[in-house]
Amino acid sequence: MNLLIFMLNMLLKNTILLNMNNSKRKYLKTFINSYPSRNYIITHQAKEFTSICPKTGQPDFGIITISYIAEKKCIELKSLKHYLQSFRNEGIFYENIINRILDDLVKVLKPKWLEVKGEFSTRGGINSIVVAEYGKKNK
Protein backbone atom coordinates (compact mmCIF):
# COMPACT_ATOMS: atom_id res chain seq x y z
CA MET A 1 0.00 0.00 0.00
CA ASN A 2 2.82 2.43 0.88
CA LEU A 3 4.52 1.69 -2.44
CA LEU A 4 1.27 2.45 -4.28
CA ILE A 5 0.89 5.76 -2.43
CA PHE A 6 4.53 6.61 -3.18
CA MET A 7 4.09 5.84 -6.89
CA LEU A 8 0.87 7.87 -7.09
CA ASN A 9 2.57 10.79 -5.36
CA MET A 10 5.52 10.61 -7.78
CA LEU A 11 3.14 10.42 -10.74
CA LEU A 12 1.17 13.45 -9.53
CA LYS A 13 4.34 15.37 -8.70
CA ASN A 14 5.85 14.59 -12.11
CA THR A 15 2.63 15.59 -13.87
CA ILE A 16 2.56 18.92 -12.08
CA LEU A 17 6.26 19.50 -12.72
CA LEU A 18 5.98 18.51 -16.37
CA ASN A 19 3.30 21.15 -16.76
CA MET A 20 5.65 23.67 -15.15
CA ASN A 21 8.63 22.87 -17.38
CA ASN A 22 8.03 25.76 -19.75
CA SER A 23 7.81 28.17 -16.83
CA LYS A 24 11.33 27.27 -15.64
CA ARG A 25 12.71 29.56 -18.33
CA LYS A 26 11.17 32.51 -16.46
CA TYR A 27 14.05 32.25 -13.95
CA LEU A 28 16.67 32.98 -16.62
CA LYS A 29 17.76 36.61 -16.96
CA THR A 30 20.41 38.01 -19.28
CA PHE A 31 22.60 41.06 -19.76
CA ILE A 32 24.20 42.54 -22.87
CA ASN A 33 27.49 41.04 -24.04
CA SER A 34 29.92 43.95 -24.32
CA TYR A 35 32.23 42.01 -26.70
CA PRO A 36 29.98 40.22 -29.22
CA SER A 37 32.63 40.24 -31.96
CA ARG A 38 35.08 38.31 -29.77
CA ASN A 39 34.74 34.51 -29.48
CA TYR A 40 35.56 34.05 -25.81
CA ILE A 41 34.30 31.10 -23.78
CA ILE A 42 32.27 31.67 -20.63
CA THR A 43 32.08 28.70 -18.23
CA HIS A 44 29.84 28.36 -15.17
CA GLN A 45 29.88 25.36 -12.85
CA ALA A 46 27.19 24.36 -10.35
CA LYS A 47 28.81 21.85 -8.00
CA GLU A 48 25.72 21.22 -5.85
CA PHE A 49 23.08 20.34 -8.45
CA THR A 50 20.27 18.10 -7.19
CA SER A 51 17.20 16.48 -8.69
CA ILE A 52 15.07 13.42 -7.92
CA CYS A 53 15.43 9.99 -9.52
CA PRO A 54 12.08 9.37 -11.25
CA LYS A 55 12.32 5.62 -10.60
CA THR A 56 13.27 5.52 -6.91
CA GLY A 57 12.34 8.95 -5.60
CA GLN A 58 15.85 9.26 -4.16
CA PRO A 59 17.89 12.45 -4.59
CA ASP A 60 20.46 12.62 -7.38
CA PHE A 61 23.56 14.81 -7.07
CA GLY A 62 25.81 16.17 -9.76
CA ILE A 63 28.01 18.89 -11.15
CA ILE A 64 26.57 20.89 -14.05
CA THR A 65 29.08 22.72 -16.26
CA ILE A 66 27.77 25.25 -18.77
CA SER A 67 30.18 26.68 -21.34
CA TYR A 68 29.23 29.03 -24.15
CA ILE A 69 30.35 31.63 -26.66
CA ALA A 70 27.94 34.52 -26.33
CA GLU A 71 26.39 36.36 -29.24
CA LYS A 72 24.45 39.35 -27.89
CA LYS A 73 23.52 38.12 -24.41
CA CYS A 74 25.17 36.59 -21.34
CA ILE A 75 23.40 34.74 -18.53
CA GLU A 76 22.99 36.49 -15.18
CA LEU A 77 24.40 34.19 -12.47
CA LYS A 78 21.78 34.64 -9.75
CA SER A 79 19.04 33.76 -12.21
CA LEU A 80 21.03 30.71 -13.37
CA LYS A 81 21.34 29.58 -9.76
CA HIS A 82 17.56 29.85 -9.22
CA TYR A 83 16.89 28.09 -12.52
CA LEU A 84 19.15 25.15 -11.60
CA GLN A 85 17.64 24.98 -8.10
CA SER A 86 14.20 24.62 -9.69
CA PHE A 87 15.16 21.03 -10.60
CA ARG A 88 15.70 20.14 -6.93
CA ASN A 89 12.28 18.50 -6.41
CA GLU A 90 11.72 17.28 -9.95
CA GLY A 91 11.73 13.61 -10.92
CA ILE A 92 13.82 13.65 -14.10
CA PHE A 93 16.42 11.48 -15.86
CA TYR A 94 19.98 12.78 -16.30
CA GLU A 95 19.68 12.88 -20.09
CA ASN A 96 16.52 14.97 -19.87
CA ILE A 97 18.09 17.40 -17.38
CA ILE A 98 21.04 18.18 -19.64
CA ASN A 99 18.99 18.50 -22.82
CA ARG A 100 16.35 20.67 -21.15
CA ILE A 101 19.01 23.01 -19.73
CA LEU A 102 20.61 23.21 -23.19
CA ASP A 103 17.28 23.96 -24.90
CA ASP A 104 16.28 26.60 -22.34
CA LEU A 105 19.64 28.38 -22.44
CA VAL A 106 19.75 28.34 -26.25
CA LYS A 107 16.25 29.81 -26.38
CA VAL A 108 17.16 32.62 -23.95
CA LEU A 109 20.76 33.37 -25.02
CA LYS A 110 20.84 32.51 -28.73
CA PRO A 111 24.60 31.84 -28.38
CA LYS A 112 27.16 31.10 -31.06
CA TRP A 113 27.99 27.86 -29.22
CA LEU A 114 26.82 26.25 -25.98
CA GLU A 115 27.68 23.02 -24.15
CA VAL A 116 26.04 21.58 -21.04
CA LYS A 117 27.80 18.78 -19.18
CA GLY A 118 26.39 16.85 -16.23
CA GLU A 119 28.66 14.69 -14.07
CA PHE A 120 26.36 12.74 -11.77
CA SER A 121 27.29 10.93 -8.57
CA THR A 122 27.72 7.18 -8.52
CA ARG A 123 24.50 5.20 -8.19
CA GLY A 124 24.56 1.41 -8.16
CA GLY A 125 28.29 1.43 -8.88
CA ILE A 126 27.90 3.48 -12.07
CA ASN A 127 28.55 7.17 -12.49
CA SER A 128 27.09 9.01 -15.46
CA ILE A 129 28.36 11.89 -17.59
CA VAL A 130 25.97 13.47 -20.10
CA VAL A 131 27.07 16.16 -22.58
CA ALA A 132 24.86 18.08 -25.03
CA GLU A 133 26.04 20.75 -27.44
CA TYR A 134 24.57 23.45 -29.68
CA GLY A 135 26.24 25.28 -32.55
CA LYS A 136 29.88 25.39 -33.61
CA LYS A 137 32.64 26.15 -31.10
CA ASN A 138 34.93 27.83 -33.66
CA LYS A 139 32.40 30.09 -35.34
Per-range role (PLM):
Residues 8-139:
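N-terminal intrinsically disordered, cationic/polar leader segments
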